[in-house]
Amino acid sequence: MDRREQIAHLAATREEEMLLVRVCEKLDTAVQRDIPAATNFLSKREQMLVCEVLRGAPIRFFGGLSTAEREISCYLPDYLDEDWLTGEDGPVAAVRAAFFERDTLTHRDFLGALMGCGVKRETIGDIYVAEGRCDFLVTREVLPYLLQNFLSAGRTKLHVERIVVPDVSVPEQKVRQIRDTVPSLRLDGIVSSGFSISRGKAAEYISAGKCELNYAPCVKGDKQTAESDVITVRGLGKIRLDAVGGNTKKGRICVEITRFL
């Protein structure tokens, strides 16, 4: 199977296929010429697909922090280290948008404001919202535009400046620990338990294409899950199946789930 056939086989959509072709060709060229190169920010699924297609290639991923979900993929020659990525000539920059603490803004508020400002999602990395500020990573190409034009989120005025990546403030992740019993480890049952919705409603979300299992689209409610699986549902959020225990006297399976708030 050649590269194009492999990508076509792995990609879930035409858009995903075109993205993989662009990314892999760019990184391939950089490796062959031994020159630095970086992509836009990729989702976890996109990162997994790039790893699969370019298996064995000397590429790396970088999102600014070790916990980052959205990361760029890059190739660095031996004469460059990771510090170059966030330097003056590097492909990634960090931004802080400050606002009055009395104003309450969410991740959704900032993402919507950034999209409304005219930048594309792939130019934005992870977004970290805390009291009075929001820190996020961007590709260097959009930095000057954002510093001049990203002035508000809704009706809230913003003071925007570039900061160094080590100064990015990451708020503590709020989670809810859930202990429950389920009849089986089917995806629809775990979604029902993790998000406290009916199994029928969970099945609707899944069949509508709103669910990802380990960052891959999944439309089968009867798909079996396992420990450490990560499930995201558009409109509901993200959960992780942390532990699968024994059975109750009635034959139900004990599970422990983390819901990310």
Predicted region positions:
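Basic (Lys/Arg-enriched) interaction patch that binds polyanionic ligands
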Residues: 184-235
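Ferredoxin-like alpha/beta domains used as RNA- or RNAP-binding modules
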Residues: 1-194, 217, 237-261
